[in-house]
Amino acid sequence: MAVVLADRIVGAIIGAAVADAAAQPLHWIYNPEKLSTILAQEGPCPEFRPQSANPFYRRETGQQTCYGDQAFVLLESLCECRGLDVGDLQQRTYKFFGPGSEYDTPVNDPYRARGGPRVQLPIEGPWRHASLKSFLKNMDAGKTETGCDIDNQIDGIAKLAPVVALYAGKPEMLEKVEAATRVTQNNDLCVVVTLAAARFLEYYILNGSGQSCGRSHSPCKAKLIQGSQRADSQCFHKHMSFAWCIPGSATWGADSRQVR
């Protein structure tokens, strides 16, 4: 059983990285008609499209998006520090995405003045998006809280696999996920949505895929940490009501609504 659990832990990390790379050539296509046309051309297997159709940036197929690269930095920090060290994660993130990095281009300069010449898209190379730009500026200003307080995009969910894999089943898991998320996104809505996703991933890491994690009429017998043993980490936030249906999670009750 221990070997199976170890396989699921590794699988969560590798699976997230592979999925990110597989989707990268089709990243950020916001035009539904354009995306539908491309998918129709690709057939049933659009993964790892050889030619990028990304309208904002172009990277070689197999490379990560800005989200996958954040997950890599988080994984590296967790391994080197044998756990979450926010200060180390901040420094590694700054080095990976900051001055002199592959992400450091004139187009994605955090201090780039508005109203300049129109940028020709897509650019060659990775894209440094809003939360990372805000993070870099907060680091430059010497702030302790480095995350962007207005960004509520998908970063937290996309990069959570390493930290959930390390702390799955432990009382401090939610606390660690929140701390890692707030390094670049200091936004409550972003945090609570990420925590909900973390509970789903934790469930499957600990229990496998044989049992459904969705809404059920009977109590789940999965052995997950209950609320009395787990750090608060936004559990009672108003936005978490949609996550109450996760059996065995910190908010799970026998009627799928009872907060413990």
Regions picked out by a protein language model, each given a short descriptive name:
Residues 1-260:
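Structured, active/binding-site neighborhoods that engage oxygen-rich ligands
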